[in-house]
Amino acid sequence: MLMRLLRMAERDGGRCAGLVLLIGAVFGVGLVRLLQEGLQLSPQQSLRVLVLAMLHLVGPLVVALIAFTRLTPLWLRRGRQGGPHGGWLTLGPAFLVGPLLLIHALMGALVGGVLASAQGGLELGLLHGVGAIVPMDLLSALLRTALYLAAAALLCFWEGQRRLPRQAGAEDLIASLIAREIALMVGLKLIWTLAVHPMTLPTLP
């Protein structure tokens, strides 16, 4: 079962990874340019702010939104057709693929940010960027992303079990599910920020 879940998570990741990398890189380029040209921050400071933004807000949200649009029909179908293991086949891959996609988004943002900055080279810039990652912030972001996707997959599984097969693939149902997944994600983010891991802003050197 575990190997099956891993293979499914790998396939699900392949549906989203390219877009996640692209959006991460675009965000990294845009934010670093804004910070350096608009706020006159140094390259090191800009990368620290980029990492902070990716881990506390942008990364998990972008990954979740892309996954919702790409994987919701798949989660719904698995919940409806998975048989006695439908719950595992729906929630398991969703929980596993979230952290992997967040790593893709973070690496894309760092590469984009380094290329947009005035760092001496890509390797040196990446070292500065990776060095700015706080382990507990990274762990929190990984867990939060996994939670977002698992909660959305659970919603799809519930709908797949509740709806008739001919209704479960309807476009209006998919759109409704995505909207509810977004609302669920916002609620989970609010609870996480207030009760589990409040955001703290570090002092820039």
Locate each region found by the language model.
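Hydrophobic alpha-helical transmembrane segments
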Residues: 1-54, 85-96, 119-137, 191-205
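Selective transmembrane-helix segments that form parts of the transport pathway or gating/packing helices
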Residues: 13, 17, 21, 86-110, ...
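Membrane-interfacial helix-loop-helix connectors in multipass membrane proteins
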Residues: 34-55, 107-146, 150, 155-176, ...
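Long, hydrophobic alpha-helical segments
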Residues: 52-72
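Short cytoplasmic-facing helical segments at TM-TM junctions of multi-pass membrane proteins
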Residues: 74-91, 167-170
